[in-house]
Regions:
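Sec-dependent signal peptide recognition
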Residues: 2-10
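Terminal low-complexity, poorly structured segments
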Residues: 11-12, 140
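C-terminal motif of bacterial Sec signal peptides marking the signal peptidase cleavage site
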Residues: 15-18
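N-terminal hydrophobic targeting signals that begin at the initiator methionine
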Residues: 1-2, 20
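Calycin-type beta-barrel ligand-binding domains and close structural analogs
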Residues: 20-38, 46-53, 57-190
Length: 190
């Protein structure tokens, strides 16, 4: 997944140096997709002086769980704003709200990233990135198909398995260790 999409969608995670697995397929098969109207609207992430807005709405082409997103980064130094169109696919696995995301702009990315999400009692959207080491272990032990490449910071993981098998893996783990501990927190602005 390109840096531009990671920075825009997972601004806080990138600022913290987080890495996450990429997949050729979404986290769940389309039969598990759900429309989640609570995500519709405009959300804002403010982290370490960086401000990123995301406008989310359901896709007219494929409304079952597919959302179009436009991320806009407001630079802190007054330079030009950057934007990235993205696609989200929302689903439920073992009682958890999960999503797959990818860049759909000029530098379209064919791979997906994964997150777990929830709306807290304050109406904030909390997002937990998929844990790279958990998926690296799953590939190394044969629980999932994919490739693991070691790098100076840990591992790069690219899953090639089916959405059905990825969803089954997440379900059998009960979410434990599959997603990070520290959420990205977004405030709804509209």
């Amino acid at each position: 997944m390109n840096t531009f999409t990671r920075v825009l969608f997972a601004a806080a995670a990138m600022l913290l140096g987080a890495c996450y697995p990429e997949s050729k397929n979404p986290i769940a098969p389309s039969s598990m997709n759900v429309n989640d109207s609570t995500l519709e609207g405009t959300w804002c992430v403010r982290e370490k002086g960086q401000v990123v807005f995301y406008h989310m709405h359901h896709s007219e082409k494929d409304p079952r769980g597919v959302m179009n997103v436009l991320g806009v980064e407001v630079p802190k130094n007054g330079s030009k704003m950057t934007q990235a169109p993205m696609e989200l696919i929302t689903a439920r696995i073992a009682g958890m709200n999960v999503l797959s995301f990818r860049n759909t702009g000029p530098k379209e990315n064919k791979t997906f990233g994964f997150m777990r999400y929830e709306i807290d009692w304050r109406g904030r959207l909390k997002l937990w990135m998929a844990d790279e080491s958990t998926f690296a272990d799953a590939v190394s032990t044969g629980k999932l198909r994919g490739k693991v490449k070691k790098n100076q910071f840990g591992s790069d993981v690219t899953l090639s398995d089916t959405s059905e098998r990825i969803a089954a893996f997440v379900a059998t783990q009960g979410g434990k260790g599959v997603f990070g501990d520290d959420p990205i927190v977004m405030e709804k602005v509209r």
